[in-house]
Amino acid sequence: MKKNHEKHADKKEAAKEELEKDLQPKDESAVKDEQGAGCGCETSKENPQEDKAEQNSSTGGKCEKNDDVLSPEKRIEELEAKCRDWQDQYLRKAADFENYRKRMIREKQEAIDYANSNLLLDLVQVLDDFDRAIDAGKTQGGESVNNAFVEGVVMIKNQMVSMLSSKYGLSYYPAKGEAFDPNLHEAVSMIQSPDVKEAVVGEELQKGYKLKERVIRHSKVMVLMPAEKQDEKKAEESEAADKKNEN
């Protein structure tokens, strides 16, 4: 009985020792190996230099990429190019606006200067009537009453011309004896003359007037033409008429 009890105690002791061995912590290296094997990762103790090289290469590649994207020199070049572009656009817009401003000022001044052109054109016809009255009084001649009448009409006409010139800028430009200019003269007739070498105004049939620098009524004139030029002009007119008929 006693022997059986001792055997049973020995078995208990052996089981207790085995359990304590199992519960003891494993070696740190073994634990790390098991953890590495469990997660499928390779241990870095065997080749630490290779791991460092790989890390350096990966970080170096990232740095190079960041340098390409955020390079200060390239960023400065881009900003300078944008500044030049904006400056060029600004200068162009400023020049356009300045031209627009000058054009508006000029058009406004022209509108002010020539606002009364239609009224003055009507008054020019009144001046024509004064000239006809003066010519009629001079042709009658003779009596002193007629001379006084003509002088009075001349005074009124001169006063009116002076007022229109000083206040509104209306002026008469003479045409007789001047070279023919289609911008100033309207040719009513042309006569061939051996005494002239170029087209000249031989007679003024109706006076021409300017409002400041603009012609508001062309003078109607008779033009003296040299023989050759008149023939050339007639030939040109006939050619133009033939072309119109052909079309």
UniProtKB/Swiss-Prot annotation:
Residues 1-68, 226-247 are annotated as: Disordered. The gene is grpE. This is Protein GrpE. Belongs to the GrpE family. Homodimer. One of its GO terms (cellular component) is cytoplasm. Participates actively in the response to hyperosmotic and heat shock by preventing the aggregation of stress-denatured proteins, in association with DnaK and GrpE. It is the nucleotide exchange factor for DnaK and may function as a thermosensor. Unfolded proteins bind initially to DnaJ; upon interaction with the DnaJ-bound protein, DnaK hydrolyzes its bound ATP, resulting in the formation of a stable complex. GrpE releases ADP from DnaK; ATP binding to DnaK triggers the release of the substrate protein, thus completing the reaction cycle. PANTHER family: GRPE PROTEIN (PTHR21237), GRPE PROTEIN HOMOLOG, MITOCHONDRIAL (PTHR21237:SF23). It is found in: Cytoplasm. GO terms for biological process: protein folding. InterPro entries: GrpE (IPR000740), GrpE_coiled_coil (IPR013805), GrpE_head (IPR009012). Its main location: cytoplasm. It comes from the Bacteria. Residues 7-35, 43-54, 228-247 have a biased composition (Basic and acidic residues).
